[in-house]
Amino acid sequence: MKTAVAFDFASGDSPENINVNPDRSLTVSLLGVPANKPPKLVQITPSGQRSTLVNGHLGDQITGNTRGSDGTVYYNVDSDGTARNGVWKLPPHGRPERLAALPDGLPNGIAIDPAGRTLYAADSYNSTVWAVPTSGGQAKIWLNGPALAADPHGSLPLGVNGVRFHKGAVWLSNYSQGKLLRIPVTAHGTPGPIHTVADNIPDFDDFAFLNNHSDIVFAAQNDPTDRVTVVRPNGTTQVALTTGDGLASPTTTAISGDKLYIADAGFKAPHDAKLQRATINLHARTGHPRHH
């Protein structure tokens, strides 16, 4: 386990989400709010060089981000300002613009379908996944209900959080219910039945798949659980990384080849905000990261 990038929590650089680009660079959402600073969307090259893509507004949060095949970056903004809350896009060499407004809530994880036509945005306060056309237009409720709601007894009142489109289905994490859900997408684009893959993952923030063909998931479990857990397709889980490996409020994971990236938001003192990198042993049946 290595620190790939060290962040300065006091300047607002608290990483929330990671997307791996084809050139192996990373697009990283930095929250800002925990240190009362504006949020940012940054790109980090494999050599660690950093450039700022978007400077947000003080009080807003940039949460999930994803990428279209043409290089457009799509990201969620959580804002008290109705003119900014919602799903945004940043075209290559363009300027950021809001694609769709969302009602008051907490826009969080975001995913794009393989055809590049539809974005799926989680709303952690409103128990909802919104569908947003990449061509623009009004956000529509794709799925909502109790499976996406928060557990009132959880450490935080957050429901649906992470979103991935994988093998013809939308996969979701429910933060306070501690569940991994799989919802097939029908030929008409509507949600099929909700399948609970695993239900024992407390403080389940976001996740990544081992690769495009595997259903093995690396789940990031935020405070106070503070671990990365491997979830197998049959729902069994195994802890892979803990605070002993340097985890500090892990918010998400991302995978590039045999490299596992973990975003550590550093919410708790000493606020050790960073990106960590581990090597996955792809030949091991556990799919565990190697500790080095």
Predicted regions and their residues:
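Short loop/turn segments immediately following the C-termini of beta-strands
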Residues: L31-V33, D78-D80, S124-Y125, T134, ...
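Short loop/turn segments that connect beta-strands within beta-propeller blades
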Residues: I44-Q49, L90-R95, P133-G137, P184-G189, ...
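Blade-level signature of beta-propeller repeat domains, shared across WD40, Kelch, NHL, RCC1
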Residues: T252-H292
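Beta-rich, blade/repeat-based domains predominating
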Residues: A10-S25, S29-L30, K37-P38, G56-R84, ...
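A short beta-strand motif characteristic of beta-propeller blades
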Residues: K2-F9, Q49-G56, R95-A101, Q138-G154, ...
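Hydrophobic alpha-helical segments and helix pairs
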Residues: G86-W142
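A short loop-to-beta-strand structural motif that recurs across blades of beta-propeller domains
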Residues: P39-V42, N85-W88, T128-A131, K179-L181, ...
